[in-house]
């Protein structure tokens, strides 16, 4: 596709007058994102991303604004779109646009605009220079470049991918032989999956449902579909609010973990009729189907905290009961099924970003510090990598964790030489073998 089909648009946001509000929130978030701020201080003179043109497709939130400005502080040029139609915080997008950064994002995109916004990030400035790095969340940007703009691939040094779903897409490409550049899997860094996915969801899942519904969660029967890291955090979130939580699972290991964590583990069909809230966390498709909707009681709340909107069969719901749909407020809709009202949050998309503001700044600093280190590594050392999916090395995973300890008042013990020799590690780490499971 010719670059002439994408004329230069400096930015597109909902309301640029929100910039001052967004800037205040960004400054507040910076105080809670010690990893990113430490990288700015460490690399400000070295400028390790100088010359990089990073196209990013990741939720355009206040926390993401801190990531964007970190990449720029390290020398990069950046363009940005959001990876979800509902996840943009308009004040964050406005603040980034007001800072002279090309951002194309607003809350409530339709599918056509969503695609348009991603496309705008492929070329930089009035000179329309093409991207040479990708920072993705879910794989939509990556797929657009590879499938629709293959002529740009040769100039791209690599990509980093944020989330479970996007990583799955990358491994599918490796298997099919269609991944044309090296990729770093951010999601499975310990300091991402065991923190963002678990502790982030532990705080943001309940926050979203409360904001959307004003329900008293204590005593409510909640079904959490899936018990991976996201499911673990989500189940803990509702348990902490006093809910009675049941888990569904396909994996015997995760099911055993859930049972030993004190949750009942049941088939969805056996518990759905009594559920007050159902939340999907699996990253798979077709978890809540038409047959399940028909079993739900009046006023059941249904939502999803996986990346895409295909865990809940919204197509069936809209085809068969769309005429009954009533918008209660943005991202909260009521459908009537056989005389019973079913409440759908965020149209089945990410509830914590559709109905709230996502994970707290501190835990996102973990994830985004990983992203920044991955971009530095691929930009400077791409020749060392094949067109495969890689993990950040353990010493960098440990570095990300270490950068966040002082904020929490954590003090580390230090190994003596004889102790390090005894367990076969260096005094300064890494402290665990690659096969260690945290």
From Swiss-Prot:
Enzyme class: hydrolase
Ligand binding (NAD(+)): 163-165, 197, 226-231, 249, 284, 305-307, 352
Cellular localization per UniProt: Cytoplasm
Reactions performed catalytically: S-adenosyl-L-homocysteine + H2O = L-homocysteine + adenosine
Keyword Plastid: no
UniProt signal peptide: none
Any one GO molecular-function label of the UniProt entry: adenosylhomocysteinase activity
EC number per UniProt: 3.13.2.1
Top-level taxon in the UniProt lineage: Bacteria
UniProt keywords, alphabetically: Cytoplasm, Hydrolase, NAD, One-carbon metabolism
Entry keyword annotation includes Hydrolase: yes
Pathway the protein contributes to: Amino-acid biosynthesis; L-homocysteine biosynthesis; L-homocysteine from S-adenosyl-L-homocysteine: step 1/1
Listed GO CC annotations: cytosol
Cofactor: NAD(+)
SUPFAM superfamilies: Formate/glycerate dehydrogenase catalytic domain-like, NAD(P)-binding Rossmann-fold domains
UniProt feature coiled coil, ranges: none
Family of the protein in this entry: Belongs to the adenosylhomocysteinase family.
Main function: May play a key role in the regulation of the intracellular concentration of adenosylhomocysteine.
NCBIfam families in UniProt: ahcY, PRK05476.2-3
Protein name (database record): Adenosylhomocysteinase
Source species of the chain: Flavobacterium johnsoniae (strain ATCC 17061 / DSM 2064 / JCM 8514 / BCRC 14874 / CCUG 350202 / NBRC 14942 / NCIMB 11054 / UW101)
Gene coding for it: ahcY
């Amino acid at each position: 596709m010719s670059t002439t089909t994408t004329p230069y648009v400096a930015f597109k946001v909902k309301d640029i007058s929100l910039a001052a509000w967004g800037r205040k929130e960004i400054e507040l978030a910076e105080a809670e994102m010690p990893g990113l701020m430490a990288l700015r201080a460490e690399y400000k003179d070295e400028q390790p991303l100088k010359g990089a043109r990073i196209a990013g497709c990741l939720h355009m939130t206040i926390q993401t604004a801190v990531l964007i400005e970190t990449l720029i502080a390290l020398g990069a040029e950046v363009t940005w779109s959001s990876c979800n139609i509902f996840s943009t915080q308009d004040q964050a997008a406005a603040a980034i646009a007001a800072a002279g950064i090309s951002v194309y994002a607003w809350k409530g995109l339709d599918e056509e605009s969503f695609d348009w916004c991603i496309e705008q990030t492929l070329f930089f400035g009035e000179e329309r220079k093409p991207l040479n790095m990708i920072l993705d969340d879910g794989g939509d940007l990556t797929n657009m470049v590879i499938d629709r703009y293959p002529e740009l691939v040769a100039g791209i040094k690599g990509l980093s991918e944020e989330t479970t779903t996007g990583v799955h897409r990358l491994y599918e490409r490796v298997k099919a032989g269609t991944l044309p550049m090296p990729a770093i899997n951010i999601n499975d860094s310990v300091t991402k999956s065991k923190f963002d996915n678990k502790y982030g969801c532990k705080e943001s899942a309940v926050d979203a449902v409360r904001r959307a519904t004003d329900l008293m969660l204590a005593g409510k029967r909640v079904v959490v579909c899936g018990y991976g890291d996201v499911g673990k955090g989500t189940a803990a979130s509702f348990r902490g609010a006093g809910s009675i939580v049941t888990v569904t699972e396909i994996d015997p290991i995760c099911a055993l973990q859930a049972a030993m964590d004190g949750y009942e583990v049941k088939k969805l069909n056996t518990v759905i009729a009594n559920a007050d809230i159902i939340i999907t966390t699996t990253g798979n498709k077709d978890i809540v189907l038409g047959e399940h909707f028909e079993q739900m009681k009046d006023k059941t709340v249904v939502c999803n905290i996986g990346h895409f909107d295909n865990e809940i069969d919204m197509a069936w719901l809209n085809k068969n009961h769309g005429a009954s749909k009533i918008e209660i407020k943005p991202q909260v809709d009521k459908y009537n099924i056989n005389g019973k009202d079913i409440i759908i949050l965020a149209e089945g998309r990410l509830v914590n970003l559709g109905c709230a503001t996502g994970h707290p700044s501190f835990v996102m600093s973990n994830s985004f510090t990983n992203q920044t280190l991955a971009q530095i590594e691929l930009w400077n050392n791409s020749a060392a990598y094949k067109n495969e999916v890689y993990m950040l090395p353990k010493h960098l995973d440990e570095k990300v964790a270490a950068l966040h300890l002082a904020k929490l008042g954590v003090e580390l013990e230090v190994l003596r030489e004889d102790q390090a020799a005894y367990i076969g590690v260096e005094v300064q780490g890494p402290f665990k073998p690659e096969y260690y499971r945290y």
